[in-house]
């Protein structure tokens, strides 16, 4: 009888060590830690659950009544300061920024096109070439001659040479 018990335990151990196919039937082997799913199917289910939780939270938030805005936003009162009686002007100080303090651009701000060639508008991605004039170019327009670069390479070169080779002038020798 003792040998029959050993045979049954060895049979269940051999069954447990055999790999099981994915429950979804994709053809890959599943793991008990992943609910007998393969890693790809398990990741998909986890992603769906996370998306569902986010959507559920968004729906609950939209149904939740928001308190009136007047409770949170209090308008700052205007402060009137009267200077000495010599001046007849009244100064009004407000907490709101004045229009002269904030500069307004006449043109609407456009996002910088750092991933496109300035000449042909071709997408360059990571292979874009940054020129010294500050623009990004494709492989065809990367040279200064091909895109009419406004950067003065000669002047910069002259400046670097002058900096690297300072003029050394010795004092004049005095004769007796």
From Swiss-Prot:
Q: Where are the zinc fingers (AN1-type)?
A: 111-157
This protein's UniProt keywords: Metal-binding, Zinc, Zinc-finger
Give the boundaries of each A20-type zinc finger: 16-50
Cited Pfam families? zf-A20, zf-AN1
Using the record, list the residue span of the signal peptide; answer none if the entry has no such feature.
none
GO biological process per UniProt:
defense response to other organism; proteasome-mediated ubiquitin-dependent protein catabolic process
Question: What Gene3D superfamilies does the annotation carry?
Answer: 1.20.5.4770, AN1-like Zinc finger (4.10.1110.10)
Residues annotated as binding Zn(2+) 2 are 117, 120, 138, 141
Q: Which GO terms describe its molecular function?
A: DNA binding; ubiquitin protein ligase activity; zinc ion binding
Binding locations of Zn(2+) 3: 131, 133, 147, 149
Q: Which residues bind Zn(2+) 1?
A: 22, 26, 38, 41
What is this protein for, i.e. what is its function?
A: May be involved in environmental stress response.
Protein name per Swiss-Prot or TrEMBL: Zinc finger A20 and AN1 domain-containing stress-associated protein 9
């Amino acid at each position: 009888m003792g040998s029959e018990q050993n045979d049954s335990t060895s049979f269940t151990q051999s069954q447990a060590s055999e790999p099981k196919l994915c429950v979804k039937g994709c053809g890959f082997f599943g793991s008990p830690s992943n609910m007998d799913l393969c890693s790809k199917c398990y990741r998909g289910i986890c992603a769906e659950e996370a998306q569902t939780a986010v959507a559920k939270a968004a729906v609950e938030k939209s149904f939740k009544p928001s308190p009136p805005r007047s409770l949170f936003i209090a308008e700052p009162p205007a402060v009137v300061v009267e200077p000495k009686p010599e001046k007849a002007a009244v100064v009004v100080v407000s907490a709101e920024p004045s229009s002269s303090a904030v500069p307004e651009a006449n043109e609407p701000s456009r996002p910088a096109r750092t991933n496109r060639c300035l000449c042909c508008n071709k997408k360059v991605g990571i292979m874009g070439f940054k020129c010294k004039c500050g623009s990004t170019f494709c492989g065809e327009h990367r040279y200064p001659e091909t895109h009419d670069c406004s950067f003065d390479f000669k002047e910069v070169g002259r400046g670097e040479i002058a900096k690297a080779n300072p003029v050394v002038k010795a004092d004049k020798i005095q004769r007796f």
